[in-house]
């Protein structure tokens, strides 16, 4: 065996959605801001993403993270997230997993509040403890807002409307009933197909761009909303993002975008609890902490709560003789 690269990771999951935290083998990442660091990774470190997200080391639904030094003077650390298509701007389930893993493995000190630099902006996370274990993690996300509502869509003789909202990334929100589908495993393949069609349709018709950050643009995912199954849940959802990737969790940034749409419609009030259920029957708890503005858009600061579990400690190698050493994806 010949080894040209060695990577170490700690893997975790949040309501079934994986997070692979890369703890060793990462070269220096250049950039003054976290957004600049994201661009650097896109230009120079995409091979690392492919090696650790793609098969045979990962899979189509794998999600990853690199913990960086803080980009701002008052933050504890920074995060960069990756998936099957590229490098994302924020990831809510990732924040929950990073805080849990960092505390339970001794990477982070045992404290309640953490300030995190993400490409989408500053995120504040809070750990709730049960003895020495992390019981749950809450995070105050970046200001989230409805970008456009009631956007008309016409695809394959179907006519319907979506709301476009930002929760750290841009999402289109649609009711699964528009297609006669339920948010369950049986209808998942059809939902994935619709997710890709809706994303491509919107991006062919309009430019979706954050009013203050040039680097935050495009539809990241499509949220399919449905009636809940569990007692006490408000809504059920599945998010299709990146290249047809399925979020197993309720999706942290998607939940933030959903909170923004519900608040804008008057369905969710400040301080009310919103229980967002996912396709694995897991739940995130969300609420509106405060009301603010992003440029000319009314926005909310959402709080999202969930829990994570460590699944493994791994060491991966790259053999230069292996024709598949950068990995591959089967959709």
From Swiss-Prot:
Q: Which SUPFAM superfamilies match?
A: Diaminopimelate epimerase-like (SSF54506)
Q: Which InterPro entries match?
A: Pro_racemase_fam (IPR008794)
GO molecular function terms noted in the UniProt entry: 4-hydroxyproline epimerase activity
- The superkingdom of the source organism is Bacteria
Similarity comment: family membership: Belongs to the proline racemase family.
- What is the name of the protein in this document? Uncharacterized protein BA_0901/GBAA_0901/BAS0853
Organism per entry: Bacillus anthracis
């Amino acid at each position: 065996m010949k080894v040209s690269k060695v990577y170490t990771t700690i893997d975790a999951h949040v309501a079934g959605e994986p997070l692979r935290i890369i703890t060793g083998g990462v070269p220096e990442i250049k950039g003054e801001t976290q957004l600049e660091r994201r661009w650097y990774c896109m230009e120079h470190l995409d091979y690392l993403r492919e090696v650790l997200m793609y098969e045979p080391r990962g899979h189509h639904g794998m999600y990853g993270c690199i913990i960086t030094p803080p980009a701002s003077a008052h933050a504890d650390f920074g995060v960069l997230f990756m998936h099957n298509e590229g490098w994302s701007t924020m990831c809510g389930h990732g924040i929950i997993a990073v805080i849990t893993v960092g505390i339970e493995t001794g990477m982070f000190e045992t404290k309640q509040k953490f300030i995190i630099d993400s490409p989408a902006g500053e995120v504040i996370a809070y750990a709730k403890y049960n003895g020495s274990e992390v019981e749950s993690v809450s995070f105050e996300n970046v200001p989230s807002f409805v970008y456009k509502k009631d956007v008309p869509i016409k695809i394959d003789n179907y006519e319907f409307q979506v709301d476009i909202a930002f929760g750290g990334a841009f999402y289109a929100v649609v009711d699964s009933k528009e297609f006669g589908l339920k948010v369950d495993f049986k209808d998942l393949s059809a939902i994935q197909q619709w997710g890709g069609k809706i994303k491509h349709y919107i991006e062919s018709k309009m430019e979706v761009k954050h009013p203050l950050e040039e680097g935050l643009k495009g539809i990241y995912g499509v949220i399919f909303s449905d009636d809940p199954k569990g007692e006490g849940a408000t809504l059920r959802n599945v998010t299709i993002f990146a290249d047809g990737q399925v979020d197993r969790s309720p999706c942290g940034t998607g939940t933030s975008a959903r909170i923004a749409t519900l608040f804008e419609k008057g369905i969710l009030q400040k301080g009310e609890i919103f229980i967002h259920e996912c396709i694995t029957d897991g739940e995130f708890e969300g609420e509106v902490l405060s009301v603010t503005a992003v440029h000319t858009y009314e926005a909310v600061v959402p709080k999202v709560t969930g829990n994570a579990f460590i699944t493994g400690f791994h060491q991966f190698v790259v053999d230069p003789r292996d024709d598949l050493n950068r990995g591959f994806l089967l959709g």
